[in-house]
Structure formats: C-alpha cells, structure tokens
Amino acid sequence: MATLRPELRELWQELCVELVLGQRGDLTGAAAGRRDRLHAERLAQLKSGSYTVAGPLALGATAVGGTPAVHRALHRYGIHAGVAFGLRDEVLGVWGDPAVTGKPAGDDLLTGKSTVLLSLAMDRLSSSAAEALQKTGCAAMTSLDVAVLQDALFTAGVNDDMEKLILRHVEDACLSLTDEALHPVGVAGLMDLTKTLAWRTS
C-alpha cells in the first residue's frame, strides 16, 4: 500500500469501506428479515456494482491516467454490469444447480439474505406461499420448505422478473460502452465480460 500513488491508495480505501458497508448491510438485513426493495437494491449496487466491477475499473483507469470522461463511462458501465452480476447470483442462489454452483440448492432461501429477488417475491406470492417466505433464514426451514418455495417463486413469475431486470442492466451497461472516450479494444473486452457476468451458470 505504501508504494501506491496517493490517488490509487485513496480509491483502494474507498473500496474497502464499500466492502464493509455491503457485508454489514447483508448481515443486518438478514438478521432483521428485511425484504424491502430499496435496501436490496442498495446492497446490490454496493456489493456487486461498486466494489466488484466499478471500483476495479476505476483503479485501472486511474493507474493509466484515464480522462474524466473515461472514468464517467466506466463507472456507469461498472455499476450496471456489476448489478447484473449480483442479480444473476441471486437467481443461482435460488434455482442454481448445486453440482455447478458448489452451493446447496436454494442457499439464499436457507440463509434469508436480503435480495432483490426476495423483495420481488413479497409482491408476487400468494398468501400461503408468502407464509413460507417468512421462514427464510430460520433454523426451522426444511429442505421441503425450500423446494416448495422454489416452485412457488418460479410459478409466480419471479424468475421472469429477474431475467428482465438482468437484461435491462446489461443493456444499460452496453449503452455506457458507446461513449467515444473509450478505446474500441477495451470496449470489445468489456462487452464479452458483460455476457459472462450476466449469463453465467456458476
């Protein structure tokens, strides 16, 4: 750290703060059983948008002396691409194949994490299924509860809602890459990265 240029050290420290804020929000949100969309979207932007994609891009742009226009374009791209990554993580956390993801089926339902997916579920599920949703994160939740809730969420269209959200953020990320300040070679690489982030299976 001591050998980093001051502006890079400052950016790194900002990333560390965002990391702590994101993890804190994750833990407190799960403990409080928060399901509101505002909290979930704020977490998605902090955890996935800021320090997973936008922050590292800012470090790279700063290291090579990128112009303010480059920084603005990369920040817009990073937030949208990062949120798309986070939303895909939420989909995989509910319906992902354990053999591919390496996590238990319905892992996010078992832990009761505060996610955009679960905030959407609050508006979509029937009263009986919504009762099952209240069990998320509780020790009393069984594998049968998880399976029932997975099916209820899918039937209610929550998966479709998530795919639309992911696509919207992918489109906004790609639109950010049309900025003339960005180099074509870098744009091509980021376009490929966007697809990997948004449509991965693990």
Predicted regions and their residues:
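All-alpha prenyltransferase/terpene-synthase fold signal
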Residues: 1-202
